[in-house]
UniProtKB/Swiss-Prot annotation:
Gene that this sequence comes from: PRUNE1
Entry's family note: Belongs to the PPase class C family. Prune subfamily.
Organism whose genome encodes this protein: Homo sapiens
Essential for homodimerization: region residues: 393-420
Record-linked Gene3D superfamilies: DHHA2 domain, inorganic pyrophosphatase (n-terminal core)
Protein's recorded name: Exopolyphosphatase PRUNE1
Binding of Mn(2+) 2, residues: D30, D106, D179
Chain spans, region Disordered: 395-421
Modified residues (Phosphothreonine): T410
Cofactor: how and how many bound: Binds 2 manganese ions per subunit.
Length: 453
């Protein structure tokens, strides 16, 4: 694999047609390994004059945000320097020159910025339900399994098992295990095909790491934020909502809030992050397990606009549907309110509707019609000043006894919050894995308590 990837970088220097195997924009471990392994297979089994190049669909600078990928590449001795990232190859220029053929792996819909490349797509290999209206008119291979790496493994072992080396096998093996949550039947992510090909890889390469060991190490690396800057931590697992000119970032942070608040230059970093990305509010939701292996969630609301911050805190504190059970935590930082979240079952997905409601309350208090677009003749600065002037009337307009009506949830990949059969087998985000483990932990504690009685 390593020698092949070295050759791919050399091929970029030549003016010749390329077959680009492109992973999805999330660029998680499954997408990355599937692109690398599929391109490797195609290169080894296709006529010599055709060049197959795997491309990671992110900028190189974003790789440190994906700790599991960085860790795994180091473990199997593949240098990051020989990988090809999206900002290192001009796909649109290649297409215009008639030198691009695309193979999409772990997705089947091009991003809006890449829709012009649709005619270049020759093949799709994915493991999620097809959206026919958006799928390119090409050969499409889709099967609802837990990991796309399973489908790549199947193709290699059925088509050319002799090309599979230990390095590639280790990448595929670890990826399937991480994606399928260590093949845990309680989680329900792994399918019989996932299990079948993990077993086949283990039979071919008996010295592969034990499942528990590779899962634990990859999971630890995925959640590890110790080497990240504050901005990288905030961007690692982030969602954004936007309403009437106000942008709110919601970041999942996998460490104790107290430790996060003690980071040097934190306040300056938060200000810089919000300013750089035009965020009016930053909500940090910390997630970790304590020494008793119990889930802990905490919240921090950072917002320079006093009225807006107050409204958000009011709505979250008095929420009954769902109840967050917030307890104020100490914070010496101005513009930042911190809380311990007593109800650990409220995930970020369930928090999003409450934030939407808080924005509605904010605008309603100023008599701004819901859904009214920003006026072209009023500057953003003028709007911000008017919002701040309305702070007094805002607080008096909120009823402490009024129950917050739940809004339709923002769609997210979560095996816990939605039926896994609704949209096929979903990707498990770090948030979803934490949530599922929390429920299992809570269930086990309840069962143990009842048995004692």
């Amino acid at each position: 694999m390593e020698d092949y990837l070295q050759g791919c970088r050399a091929a970029l220097q030549e003016s010749r047609p390329l077959h680009v195997v492109l992973g999805n924009e999330a660029c998680d471990l499954d997408s990355t390994v599937s692109a690398l392994a599929l391109a490797f297979y195609l290169a080894k089994t296709t006529e010599a004059e055709e060049v197959f190049v795997p491309v990671l669909n992110i900028k190189r600078s974003e790789l440190p945000l994906r700790g599991d990928i960085v860790f795994f590449l180091q473990k199997v001795h593949i240098p990051e320097s020989i990988l090809i990232f999206r900002d290192e190859i001009d796909l649109h220029a290649l297409y215009q020159a008639g030198q691009l053929t695309l193979i999409l792996v772990d997705h089947h819909i091009l991003s809006k910025s890449d829709t012009a490349l649709e005619e270049a797509v020759a093949e799709v290999l994915d493991h999620r339900p097809i959206e026919p209206k958006h799928c390119p008119p090409c050969h499409v291979s889709v099967e609802l399994v837990g990991s796309c790496a399973t489908l790549v493994t199947e193709r290699i072992l059925q088509g050319a098992p002799e090309i599979l080396d230990r390095q590639t096998a280790a990448l595929l093996h670890g990826t399937i295990i991480l994606d399928c949550v260590n093949m845990d039947l309680k989680i329900g992510k792994a399918t019989p095909k996932d299990s079948k090909y993990v077993e086949k890889l283990e039979a071919l390469f008996p010295d592969l790491p034990k499942r528990n060991d590779i899962f634990d190490s990859l999971q630890k690396a995925k959640f590890d934020v110790s080497g990240l800057t504050t901005e990288q931590m905030l961007r690692k697992d982030q969602k954004t909502i936007y309403r009437q000119g106000v942008k709110v970032a919601i970041s999942a942070i996998y460490m104790d809030l107290e430790a996060f608040l003690q980071r040097s230059n934190l306040l300056a970093d938060l200000h810089a992050f919000c300013q750089a990305h035009s965020y009016d509010v930053l909500v940090a939701m910390t997630i970790f397990f304590n020494t008793h292996n119990e889930p802990v969630r905490q919240l921090a609301i950072f917002c320079p606009h006093v009225a807006l911050q107050t409204t958000i805190c009011e709505v979250l504190e008095r929420s009954h549907s769902p109840p967050l059970k917030l307890t104020p935590a100490s914070s010496t930082h101005p513009n930042l309110h911190a809380y311990l979240q007593g109800n650990t079952q409220v995930s970020r997905k369930k928090l999003l509707p409450l934030l939407q409601e808080a924005l509605s309350a904010y605008f309603d208090s100023m008599k701004i019609p819901s859904g009214q677009p920003e006026t072209a003749d009023v500057s953003r600065e003028q709007v911000d000043k008017e919002l701040d002037r309305a702070s007094n009337s805002l607080i008096s307009g909120l009823s402490q006894d009024e129950e917050d009506p739940p809004l339709p949830p923002t769609p997210m990949n979560s095996l816990v919050d939605e039926c896994p059969l609704d949209q096929g087998l979903p990707k498990l985000s770090a948030e979803a894995v934490f949530e599922k483990c929390s429920q299992i932990s809570l269930s086990q504690s309840t069962t143990a308590s009842l048995s004692k009685k």
